[in-house]
Structures are given as structure tokens and as C-alpha cells.
Amino acid sequence: KVQQLLKDYFDGKEPNKGVNPDEAVAFGAAVQGGILSGEGGDETKDILLLDVAPLTLGIETVGGVMTKLIPRNTVIPTKKSQVFTTYQDQQTTVSIQVFEGERSLTKDCRLLGKFDLTGIAPAPRGTPQIEVTFEVDANGILNVKAEDKGTGKSEKITITNDKGRLSQEEIERMVREAEEFAEEDKKVKERIDARNSLETYVYNMKNQINDKDKLADKLESDEKEKIETATKEALEWLDDNQSAEKEDYEEKLKEVEAVCNPIITAVYQRSGGAPGGGSSEEEEEEDGHDEL
């Protein structure tokens, strides 16, 4: 089949079958070994052999979402970092679960390893910044590190590719399944994202109205009461509607925003600056991290 595909791609030209496949593999391995060891000399100095990540690498975030850090077919060695945050108030531990796969949810991907980062300073949800770094070396060995940027505490895991490595057939199957279920996965992820957006907004408002550096000292008593009522009702609605549709979450978010946003605007106009003493861009950046 591969030979026929090559023939079709090159306008009917016959593939050269004069090379022994075993010899080609051995020769390629020898050349790659020479390049990696630096002992190839002049014969390999102009040769560039590129290895790639066979499947996307990422971690699980709230809702069982596969948050991707290193996409499939990324040339290795490579390194990628991303900042995440906590999902609950006063959360002192986060679990880092490393997966490979092309699906939107981790339940449909393959778990490679996991570890916990403990000792995070207790703080409101969304406040801590946890930097997760994925690094794949030239041998395909994956190192994952999680560091609390507030305390400097970190943990890491090394995942080698010699145990339980997927065959090419298994990799191709996972890619095919991702393509087959792409539309279904998209809808599920959109529903989870809509729920997370509502939760994040509500908790952000709760934190702001109780934070003296943000809204606590700037709100009138009736304004604070309106926001407290709206956020309380939204959280109760979330508890009662765990499996609501995307449109339901979006509609509920609009309802809460309709109560809170005019109050925030009024505070902004009275104080002559952005609520919380910072720019809206800074606040958006602080609140924009995926939750663990």
C-alpha cells in the first residue's frame, strides 16, 4: 500500500526497490548515532536527521481535558512551558498527570505517568501560578517538571520510551480515532470550556469583592449584596446542573455578567481606574490560566 501511495504521489513513477530494507535501517541508525555522539566527522556534518514526537504530549486539567503542550510531529529535542493555576480555594497540592494522544479528553488518551506537587501556599482559587515544563531530549526521553512560582517548590518525573512503547500501528490507530471522533470531541470540550468559564468568572467575582486590594473597599453595601446573591445563585445552579449543555452555561454566564459588570463599571468610573488597582489586561492574564 505504501509503495502504491508513493507511486501515485510521484505521478506514476516506480519506487526504487534496489535497497535492502534491513540495511537501510542499520545504515540510518549508524548515521543517527554518529550525529548524536558528535563522532560522525565530515561524513555526517551536512546530514540532518529529524526525529519527531509521534503523539501529542500534555496534562489533564479541570474537566478531564487534555491540555496539549507538545503537539504531534514536533521536532525533538524540544522544550515547552505553560503556567497553570489551582481549581479550589486554599488548595495546597496539585496532581500532574501526563498523557499522550490526540483526543480532547484524557480518558481517550494514554497515561504516561503522574506526580503531585505539594506545599503550595494556601490562596484563593486561581491565584497560585504553577509552571509546568515538558522537555523531550534527542533520545525521546520526556522530563516533566512542575514548579510553584510563589514558593519555588518543584517536583519532576522522567518518562523513558523503552517501557510500554506504542507500536506504529497503535499510534496510527490513535490518530485515526482522533480524526473519526473530532466533531464529537469538539462538542464535549466546548461544553466543558463553557462550564469552566462560568465557574472561573463566578469565583473571580467572589474573590474580588472580598479582596481589599481589588473591590472590597470600593463597593457600596447594596452593590456587594447584589454580586454576592448573583454568584451564590450561580454556584447553586452549577451544583444542580452538572450535565447542562454548552448553551445553558453560556446563558447563565450572561445572566451573572448582567448583574456584575454594570457594578464593576460603576466602581471603575468612581475610582478613575481599573478595579483592583491594575490594568484589565493584567487581570485577564492572571485569570487566564488553565486549572489543575
Swiss-Prot record:
Region (Disordered): 268-292
InterPro entries cross-referenced by the UniProt entry: ATPase_NBD, HSP70_C_sf, HSP70_peptide-bd_sf, Hsp_70_fam
Top-level division of the source organism's lineage: Eukaryota
Biased composition (Acidic residues): 280-292
GO CC term, one of those recorded: endoplasmic reticulum lumen
Gene3D superfamilies to which the protein is assigned, alphabetical: 1.20.1270.10, 3.30.420.40, Substrate Binding Domain Of DNAk, Chain A, domain 1
Keyword Endoplasmic reticulum: yes
A Pfam family it matches: HSP70
Compartments, as annotated in UniProt: Endoplasmic reticulum lumen
Assigned keywords, A-Z: ATP-binding, Endoplasmic reticulum, Glycoprotein, Nucleotide-binding
Chain location of the short sequence motif Prevents secretion from ER per the record: 289-292
GO MF terms, alphabetically ordered: ATP binding; ATP-dependent protein folding chaperone
Keyword Nucleotide-binding: yes
Main location group: endoplasmic reticulum
Glycan-carrying positions: 241
Function: Probably plays a role in facilitating the assembly of multimeric protein complexes inside the ER.
Family: Belongs to the heat shock protein 70 family.
Record-given protein name: Luminal-binding protein 2
Gene it is expressed from: BIP2
